[in-house]
Amino acid sequence: MQDQQKLARQSEAKQYVSSMNRAQQAFYAEYASFASTIQKLGIGIKSETENYSYSIVLSNDNRWVQAIGLAKRDGLKNYTGIVSLIKSPNDESTSTQSRLCESNQPSKELPGTPTPTNSPDIQCPSGYSDVLK
């Protein structure tokens, strides 16, 4: 696959997953919970495109949500976004933090689930690196 084509296809996934992260933060601010489906986010993102399939994984305790952009074509990297709850040590307020991660190598395998901490430093799953904004 030509580099320009590959970068353009990967750009779609970066934008979609990043948009899902932002939408989850807005959804949490309004409903005090995360959306369990892409449709509930109401941002017009399809769950399937020619290059990627998109999904949401919600933690059992509603402390984090993971958006996944899984490559459907060889040679493309996967993307995952994580939005996690952070409790303030000074009071009992809760805020959200997000991170966008890219697979280190092209893959069609699902990413691992995040290991959330109570700090703003959300870790990318194993085999993934932070996408700098």
Model regions and ranges:
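Amphipathic alpha-helical segments typified by the pilin-like N-terminal helix
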Residues: 1-15, 21-23
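Short, well-ordered helical secondary-structure segments
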Residues: 15-16, 21, 41, 88
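Periplasmic/extracellular, small/polar-rich flexible segments of pilin-like filament-forming proteins
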Residues: 29-133
